[in-house]
């Protein structure tokens, strides 16, 4: 018996790619906090192998689920403790701080402007008042009584008194500047000195000459100003002498280096016990008229002055 090998017949079928099916389902509730369930379902089908002898087919299905919690803020309706930021602009804090700083700067600027205006107004008022006083001084008599004048009669009297005081001060200052007694540094007759020797007697005699000339020119000053009378001045000199005698001893007859008031010759010679002020100018200067016999009768200082100037020969 002959055995034959049996070879089964196989038919090849074209295989397709596997198909993947995914299904996702989600649900969310806004009114109540709920959980959403996500389910995924995938189904895969394997390729089928068919043959003439037998055919097989298989399929697989898988599913998964994930729970996710959702947070929902509470509603602002009817709740005063929750700030509703939707109704206010962004940067509210910065706007409030900037408004406060701006208000401070604006108040400082307003204060500066007001103070400057008030000071300028006060200055203008004072300057206008001073100009008006100087401009209308002495013209109140000619002004009409119907006009409103800001200056009264008392003001006019005070202006006249000020003018009189200024004129008297000017006259006294001119008189005092004209003669500075017993000051060889400031006296005009010492400007052209040819020697360095200072003669007290010569200065006294020259001062008496200039003082007598000046008295003849300005005698009206003594009439207008009672403070320049000789009697008043002598009383003042006596009081000063009493005060000085208590502090220091009596000084010798020497020229004073400080300026004195007018008519101080009598008080000066009285204080120094000198009789030169009682001698007339002609007799005080008579010794210089005869240079031949002057060295026997004139003072030693004048003789030495003549020798130094070349008017006397030893």
Swiss-Prot record:
Q: Does the keyword Acetylation apply?
A: no
A Gene Ontology term for the protein's cellular component: vacuolar membrane
Entry-linked InterPro entries? PRM (IPR051009)
**What ranges does the record give for the region Disordered, renumbered to this chain?**
32-60, 240-309
The stretch of residues making up the signal peptide is: none
Q: Where is the composition biased (Basic and acidic residues)?
A: 254-269
- This protein's major location comes to membrane
Stated membrane topology is:
Single-pass membrane protein
Phosphoserine-modified residues are: 148, 254, 274
Q: Where is this chain's protein located in or outside the cell?
A: Vacuole membrane
For this UniProt record, the keywords arranged alphabetically read as follows: Membrane, Phosphoprotein, Transmembrane, Transmembrane helix, Vacuole
Spans traversing the lipid bilayer:
93-113
What family does this belong to?
Belongs to the PRM5 family.
Task: State what protein this is by name.
Answer: Vacuolar membrane protein FOSTERSB_4073
Q: Which organism is it from?
A: Saccharomyces cerevisiae (strain FostersB) (Baker's yeast)
């Amino acid at each position: 018996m002959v055995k034959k090998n049996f070879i089964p017949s196989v038919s090849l079928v074209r295989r397709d790619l596997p198909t993947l099916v995914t299904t996702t389902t989600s649900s969310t509730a806004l009114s109540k906090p709920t959980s959403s369930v996500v389910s995924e379902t995938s189904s895969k089908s394997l390729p089928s192998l068919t043959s003439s002898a037998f055919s097989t087919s298989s399929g697989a299905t898988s599913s998964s689920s994930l729970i996710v919690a959702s947070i929902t803020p509470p509603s602002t309706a009817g709740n005063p403790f929750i700030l509703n930021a939707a109704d206010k602009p962004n940067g509210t804090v910065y706007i409030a701080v900037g408004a406060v700083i701006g208000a401070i700067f604006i108040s400082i600027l307003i204060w500066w402007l007001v103070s400057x205006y008030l000071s300028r107004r006060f200055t203008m008022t004072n300057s206008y008042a001073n100009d008006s006083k100087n401009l209308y001084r002495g013209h109140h008599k000619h002004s009409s009584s119907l006009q409103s004048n800001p200056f009264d009669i008392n003001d006019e009297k005070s202006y006249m008194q000020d003018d009189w005081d200024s004129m008297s001060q000017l006259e006294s200052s001119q008189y005092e500047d004209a003669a500075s007694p017993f000051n060889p540094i400031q006296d005009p007759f010492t400007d052209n000195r040819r020697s360095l020797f200072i003669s007290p007697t010569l200065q006294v005699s020259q001062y008496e000459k200039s003082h007598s000339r000046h008295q003849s020119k300005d005698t009206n000053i003594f009439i207008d100003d009672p403070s320049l009378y000789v009697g008043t001045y002598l009383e003042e000199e006596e009081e000063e002498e009493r005060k000085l005698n208590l502090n220091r001893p009596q000084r010798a007859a020497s020229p004073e280096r400080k300026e004195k008031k007018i008519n101080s010759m009598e008080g000066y010679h009285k204080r120094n016990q000198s009789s030169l002020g009682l001698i007339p100018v002609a007799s005080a200067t008579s010794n210089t008229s005869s240079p031949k016999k002057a060295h026997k009768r004139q003072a030693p200082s004048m003789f030495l002055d003549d020798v130094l100037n070349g008017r006397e020969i030893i």
